[in-house]
Amino acid sequence: MNKITTTISTNNNLEYLKLAVKSVRQNCYYKDMPLIVHAENCDDGTDEWLNDNTDKYSIEYYIDHNDKPKGIGGGMNFCVDKVKTEFVNIIHSDMWCAPNQDLELLRLYDDTDKRLIASSFRIQPRIFPNDPDYRPGTVFHTMEEFGAFCYEFDSDYFDEWATEFSKQNDIKVRKAGGAGFFCRTEDYKWIGGNDPLFAPASWEDKDLFIRMQLEGYEFEMITKSILWHFSARGSHFRDEAKDDLTKKSMRQQKSEHDNIQKWIKKWGVLPEEDEETFVKPIYGTNVNTRLEWIGE
């Protein structure tokens, strides 16, 4: 009986999606687990590719064309609503799962019933000017090391590196990964998932993690589980800014502008980060920490 379902939400990110799907079937310990893909408003061939490859990769996919995009957070909600297993492994379409990424997160739940959000350490290309060598939970490499774009990514080399890195390191950080983490399915639903207020992108992850902290959830990000994250290919570097690391998409610019105003209206103050660069809870507000679960 399956314990885990992996979910992926995507929008016009086909070449990266292909890698994400391949990594689940190639590298996850539970290679045959259910795999759910939500494809929203795609016109880049994603719909056709999913239809043509559903049997090859055993994908349960949903084609969603709408006038009000659910975006990254809403796509996560949509997928989790379809999950029938105890656990859900949420990744984004610009991620690659290293070997046993799922198993190492599942092991954190042995003999515990606490509300735990588990996340993989992330390895990313250094594509933003202020990217350091390391920030808690994320290791940065040069763009040339593994390949910063889908067409040049050296997955074999990365898998070898990630396996050795996990063997040599046993680090836990109190933190969660935006647009991708592992948890009990019911714990995601209990809190209400991502707030559709912030659709299609930006600030929804901070909002979710603050609400979770206020309700007593615990967080662990571990080096024993690894994800490669191309970084921001579904937000900054999309549409007219596709893979152009010198630009930021108009959708992302608008979302950031709009959602900071929505945030202030909802929470009253801007969020702060702790020493692990994890968003701090905001106390003393009238914000509803639990949202009504509406799924789709």
For the regions a protein language model found, what residue spans apply to each?
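Short, acidic, metal-binding catalytic loop of nucleotide-sugar glycosyltransferases
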Residues: K22-D32
